[in-house]
């Protein structure tokens, strides 16, 4: 575990170092400046002087072990080596925010994965929202500034909401969050990439797609009556109870855009029917404590055959992860 922690911490620091020395091809200096500013907002919102090394976002969470089992008849159509065989998977379930005492009655559910193949790995960071609140750095910074101003008492919740309603990305995200159920378990939420990745097909062409991990048991929400009967900490116990009976399973599913879908727009829900391709099953079979809470799940760590999104926010988010990771070492 200590060696794994060192490896993934070092990955984050290498990304940060590469930025500082300008060796990442095509990276603009303003992208790094934006990432630094956003990281600063996260620390203003969530820092704890008594625990300066804590994870600054998605602080409340726990770890699990599992495996990816490929759908052989499907993955043979892709030139992505890591998908061709079973892989061990490290899993982290969490809530957004920086407070370990946060109530499980919030709507957010998050899933981070480290899939380890024979010669390479794949890391993912997802939430149960299908979209992000921003499509570019300016929107990201504006959203975070409103959060900070609200915390500092400079604006009210109502004022912040009115300002957010004026920006399409913020309004879309608020609508998406409003539509989410409060699930009784992490096992009852679907988790989404938000970004559109490129997946190399056996033909050599790349298929553009978002991806989701969809629970085989279905997405389920709590009724008002059920919610009233629960305390603020029920997700971990619900997970332990469920996984003790049988593995928790998710379909690893590609969602292929239609002809007119805007693949670079991370704040736009793809409504209606889409081609869906189930690559295989994520089978989560064991609770594994809290050791992974200190690790970094870096979505820019991609395997052979998977191309990074070509949008205006993926690189920025990865840099924010790297910067906040380096700050808490």
PLM regions: where:
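A general boundary/transition motif marking the beginning of the first structured unit of a protein
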Residues: 1-4, 227
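Bacterial N-terminal signal peptides that target proteins for export
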Residues: 3-16
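Short, linear, compositionally biased motifs with a strong N-terminal bias
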Residues: 19-22
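Sec/Tat signal peptide C-region and signal peptidase I cleavage site
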Residues: 25-29
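Active-site-adjacent core segments of small-molecule enzymes
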Residues: 30-329
């Amino acid at each position: 575990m200590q060696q794994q922690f060192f490896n993934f911490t070092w990955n984050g620091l290498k990304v940060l170092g590469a930025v500082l020395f300008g060796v990442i091809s095509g990276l603009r200096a303003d992208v790094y400046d934006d990432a630094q500013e956003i990281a600063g907002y996260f620390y203003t919102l969530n820092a704890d002087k008594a625990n300066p090394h804590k994870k600054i976002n998605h602080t409340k969470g726990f770890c699990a072990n599992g495996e990816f089992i490929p759908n052989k008849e499907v993955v043979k159509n892709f030139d992505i080596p890591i998908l061709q065989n079973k892989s061990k998977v490290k899993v982290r379930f969490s809530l957004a925010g920086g407070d370990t005492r946060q109530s499980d009655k919030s709507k957010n559910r998050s899933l981070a994965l480290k899939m380890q193949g024979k010669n390479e790995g794949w890391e993912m960071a997802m939430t149960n929202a299908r979209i992000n609140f921003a499509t570019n750095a300016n929107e990201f910074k504006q959203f975070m500034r409103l959060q900070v101003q609200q915390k500092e008492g400079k604006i009210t919740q109502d004022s912040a909401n009115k300002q957010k309603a004026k920006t399409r990305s913020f309004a879309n995200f608020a609508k998406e969050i409003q539509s989410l159920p409060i699930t009784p378990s992490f096992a009852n939420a679907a988790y989404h990439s938000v970004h559109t990745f490129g997946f190399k097909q056996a033909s050599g062409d790349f298929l553009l797609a978002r991806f989701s991990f969809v629970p085989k048991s279905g997405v389920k929400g709590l009724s008002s009556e059920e919610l009233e009967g629960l305390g603020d900490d029920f997700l971990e116990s619900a997970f332990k109870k469920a996984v003790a009976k049988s593995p928790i399973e998710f379909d690893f599913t590609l969602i292929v855009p239609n002809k007119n879908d805007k693949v670079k727009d991370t704040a736009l829900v793809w409504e209606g029917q889409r081609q869906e391709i189930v690559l295989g099953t994520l089978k989560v079979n064991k609770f594994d404590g809290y050791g992974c809470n200190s690790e970094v799940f870096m979505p820019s760590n991609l395997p052979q055959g998977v191309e990074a999104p070509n949008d205006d926010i993926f690189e920025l988010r990865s840099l924010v992860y790297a910067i906040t990771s380096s700050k808490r070492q």
